[in-house]
């Protein structure tokens, strides 16, 4: 890397800041506008950690019903998530468990540390009220994700106890479901927080 004299260093450009300042100088930007631009820049620079949590039987991907779930393994999911996270400036922590209590513990960790979550609850989707209640305490974006489209499968899979506490659901795109979910998380992180009530 070539060292440039301080006078020749380019000015850093914050994401969205240039559009905010298009019609007026920086001194006239309101504090919320500056905060929003800095929040997005800090997210990219600091690599916000996203937990990508996977429920029961997802450790068997690649060998379990490949006609439904595809040939990709959990290692492939982790690699795709890491690559997408790198593109988005996010650090991705991919985990899998067959144990409901462990999954709930990870959700508590995310809430305590204000970490966004991409969650494939697998079979817990349909009946785990413990998971639902843990997710209701979330403090950061949450996107539910599924490799297959549950709505096209058995009737018992049509119910999700997770959907009502998630920001949204991505389903039916195989491995790409995770990539799309991470992009949704990045978008949610970049949005300004909702205005306080009256």
Walk through the language-model features, giving the residues of each.
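Short beta->alpha junction loops
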Residues: 91-101
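Short, acidic/small-residue loops that bind anionic groups at enzyme active sites
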Residues: 137-153
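Short glycine-rich anion-binding loops that position phosphate/pyrophosphate groups of nucleotides
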Residues: 56-58, 122-125, 148-150
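Short acidic/histidine-rich motifs immediately flanking catalytic phosphotransfer sites
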Residues: 110-117
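Long, low-complexity intrinsically disordered regions
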Residues: 1-44
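Glycine- and acidic-residue-enriched helix-capping/strand-helix junction motifs
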Residues: 61-75
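Short, glycine-/small-residue-rich phosphate/pyrophosphate-handling segment
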Residues: 152-198
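Short Gly/Thr/Asp-enriched flexible loops that form oxyanion-binding sites at enzyme active sites
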Residues: 128-137
């Amino acid at each position: 890397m070539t060292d440039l004299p301080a006078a020749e260093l380019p000015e850093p450009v914050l994401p969205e800041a240039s559009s905010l300042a298009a019609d007026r100088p920086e001194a006239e930007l309101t504090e919320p506008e500056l905060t929003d631009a800095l929040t997005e820049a800090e997210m990219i620079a600091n690599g916000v950690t996203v937990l990508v949590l996977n429920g029961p039987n997802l450790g068997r991907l690649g060998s379990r019903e490949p006609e439904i779930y595809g040939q990709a393994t959990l290692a492939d999911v982790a690699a795709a998530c890491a690559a997408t996270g790198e593109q988005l400036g996010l650090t991705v922590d991919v985990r899998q468990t067959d144990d409901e209590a462990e999954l709930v513990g990870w959700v508590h960790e995310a809430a305590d540390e204000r970490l966004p979550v991409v969650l494939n609850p697998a079979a817990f989707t349909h009946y785990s009220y413990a998971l639902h209640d843990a997710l209701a305490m979330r403090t950061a974006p949450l996107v539910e994700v599924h490799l297959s489209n549950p709505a096209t499968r058995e009737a018992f899979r049509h119910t999700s106890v997770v959907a009502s506490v998630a920001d949204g659901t991505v389903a039916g795109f195989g491995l790409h479901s995770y990539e799309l979910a991470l992009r949704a998380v990045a978008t949610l992180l970049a949005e300004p927080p909702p205005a306080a009530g009256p």
